A protein has these predicted regions:
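Short coil-to-helix segment of the ABC ATPase nucleotide-binding domain corresponding to the Q-loop/switch region
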Residues: 101-108
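Catalytic Walker B motif of ABC-type/P-loop ATPase nucleotide-binding domains
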Residues: 164-167
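Hydrophobic anchor residue at the start of the ABC signature
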Residues: 153
């Protein structure tokens, strides 16, 4: 199987006035194309740092990270920006939608960053996440939390990313709506999407095929 993410002996240290903080301590693991993985651990364990590194939003203090076979240390800032924009889809706990844009415009925003908008593609991914077409011209504040998260998932899919990175995607939803979002993720994974979910909720982790547990910056299992 093709490895889309590979961490080798990765260390991340944050220098602070009170002393250095080691967020990740010699982490090694890989993710194969088509996997559905949860990352679990207590608050402060290093989950968010790990997600930032996987999303090419930060760089390690030491060790090696490869994304789709390319070592990120060999990429320029421009190449990293392009890779993040074109190959990674992000889904957040608080949706991060633009309140003054309608749903089509929100979903199309990553395309705008690439220099062009395909409205039909936006409609296609919104249908894929099962959002009612009557809502496509509404603004986010006119939608429920579950509907807004479906829009966020559609936005993450618009550029056909290799990897979906999800930070507590159900954390701001009730249990029933959260379950519907995870069922949607499961369906996307069945269609071939590689999905990584950071969560503290065992109920979310049960939808995934593998769990990586982080404790004190180290992989526990």
């Amino acid at each position: 199987m093709e490895q889309v993410i590979q961490f080798e002996d990765v260390v991340k240290i944050y220098p602070l006035k009170a002393g250095d903080v080691t967020a990740l301590n010699h982490i090694s693991f890989s993710v194969e194309r088509g996997e559905f993985i949860s990352i679990m651990g207590p608050s402060g364990s290093g989950k968010s740092t790990l997600l930032a590194l996987m999303g090419c939003l930060d760089t390690p203090t030491s060790g090696s990270i490869s994304m789709s076979g390319r070592a990120i240390r060999n990429m320029s800032d421009e190449e990293l920006t392009s890779f993040r924009r074109d190959k990674i889809g992000f889904i957040f706990q608080y949706f991060n939608l633009f309140p003054l844009l309608n749903i089509i415009e929100n979903v199309s925003f990553p395309q705008m960053l690439r220099g062009g908008v395909n409205e039909e593609k936006a409609r296609e991914v919104l249908r894929a996440v099962q959002l009612d077409e009557r809502l496509f011209t509404h603004t986010p504040l006119e939608l429920s939390g579950g509907q807004q998260q479906r829009v966020a998932v559609a936005r993450a899919l618009i550029n056909d990313p290799d990897i979906l990175l999800c930070d507590e995607p159900t954390g701001n939803l009730d249990s029933k709506t959260g379950a519907s979002i995870m069922e949607l993720m499961t369906e996307l994974n069945r269609k071939g999407a590689t999905i990584i979910v950071v969560t503290h909720d065992p109920g979310v982790a049960k939808y995934t095929n593998r769990t990586i547990r982080i404790v004190d910056g180290c992989i526990a299992s």
